[in-house]
C-alpha cells in the first residue's frame, strides 16, 4: 500500500496521512458549536485564530528565505515560487478577522494584545523548527492541513443564522480560496521528489498541525468551564498572579502529572535533565 501511494506521488501520500486524522479534526471542530452561547464561542474562535493569520506571511517568508539560501537544492526553486505566490494570497487575512470581531462587538485590539494559546504557539513554533532544522518543504504539511478542508457552507449558514451576515468574511473568503490552495499544495508535492526523510518530515508536520488543531478546538469547546475547573484544581493561582493563559498551562501540566506513577519518591535526587 505504501509503495502504491509513493508511486502515485507525494501529494497522494500526504492526502492519505491527513485522511487518517480528518475525522478527529471534524469532531473536535464540531464540539465548539455545542456551546450554550455559540456567538460567544465563535468570537473566541476568531480571537484564537487571529495569531495564526498574523503569523502566516512572516512564516511563509521565513521558509522562502531558507529556500533562497540553497539555490542548488532541486526543491528550492519550485518551493520558493509557490511560497512567493502564497505570500501574496495570504496578505490581509488578519484584517478579515479583525472586521469580523468588530462586527460581533469584540475589540479587535484586545485579540491583538492577547497571548496566543498554547496550541497555537506550539503549532506555529513547530513550523519554524522544522523549516530551520529539517527543510522548508515541511511547511507544506502544515498548510495542507489548514487549507485542505475549508469552512463548509453548512458552517457559514449556521454562523449567519446565529450572528447575521456581518461577521462571516473570514469564513466565506476562506471557503472560496482554501480548497484551491489545498489542491495547489498537493499538485506541487506530486511534482517534487522527496527522499524518505523529507517525506516523513512533511507527514510529521501535517500530523503535528492536526494534533495542535484538535487541542485548540478542545480548548475552545471547554471555554469558561475549563477555567473554572482549573481554578478549583489550583486554588493558589490567584496568589501567584497567574493569567488565564498561564493557568491553563499549569493545569495541563498538573493533569498530565496526575496520570503518571509517583516515581520521585523512589528516585531520590535522580531528576532533571533539561538544558539549552
Q: What kind of feature is each model-predicted range?
A:
Residues 2-276:
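Non-heme di-metal
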Amino acid at each position: 500500500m505504501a509503495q502504491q501511494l509513493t508511486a502515485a506521488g507525494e501529494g497522494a501520500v500526504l492526502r492519505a496521512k491527513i485522511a487518517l486524522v480528518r475525522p478527529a479534526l471534524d469532531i473536535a471542530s464540531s464540539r465548539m458549536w455545542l456551546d450554550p452561547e455559540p456567538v460567544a464561542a465563535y468570537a473566541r474562535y476568531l480571537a484564537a485564530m487571529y495569531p495564526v493569520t498574523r503569523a502566516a506571511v512572516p512564516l511563509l517568508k521565513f521558509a522562502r528565505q531558507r529556500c533562497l539560501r540553497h539555490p542548488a537544492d532541486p526543491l528550492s526553486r519550485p518551493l520558493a515560487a509557490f511560497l512567493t505566490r502564497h505570500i501574496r494570497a495570504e496578505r490581509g487575512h488578519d484584517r478579515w478577522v479583525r472586521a469580523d470581531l468588530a462586527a460581533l462587538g469584540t475589540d479587535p485590539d484586545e485579540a491583538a494584545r492577547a497571548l496566543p494559546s498554547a496550541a497555537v504557539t506550539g503549532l506555529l513554533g513547530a513550523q519554524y523548527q522544522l523549516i530551520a532544522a529539517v527543510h522548508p518543504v515541511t511547511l507544506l504539511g502544515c498548510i495542507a492541513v489548514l487549507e485542505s478542508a475549508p469552512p463548509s457552507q453548512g458552517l457559514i449558514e449556521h454562523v449567519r443564522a446565529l450572528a447575521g451576515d456581518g461577521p462571516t468574511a473570514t469564513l466565506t473568503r476562506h471557503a472560496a480560496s482554501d480548497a484551491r490552495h489545498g489542491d495547489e499544495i498537493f499538485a506541487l508535492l506530486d511534482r517534487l521528489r522527496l527522499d524518505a526523510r523529507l517525506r516523513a518530515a512533511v507527514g510529521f508536520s501535517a500530523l503535528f498541525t492536526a494534533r495542535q488543531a484538535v487541542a485548540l478546538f478542545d480548548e475552545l469547546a471547554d471555554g469558561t468551564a475549563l477555567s473554572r475547573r482549573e481554578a478549583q484544581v489550583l486554588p493558589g493561582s490567584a496568589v501567584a498572579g497567574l493569567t488565564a493563559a498561564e493557568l491553563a498551562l499549569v493545569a495541563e501540566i498538573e493533569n498530565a502529572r496526575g496520570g503518571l506513577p509517583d516515581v520521585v519518591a523512589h528516585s531520590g535526587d535522580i531528576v532533571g535533565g533539561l538544558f539549552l
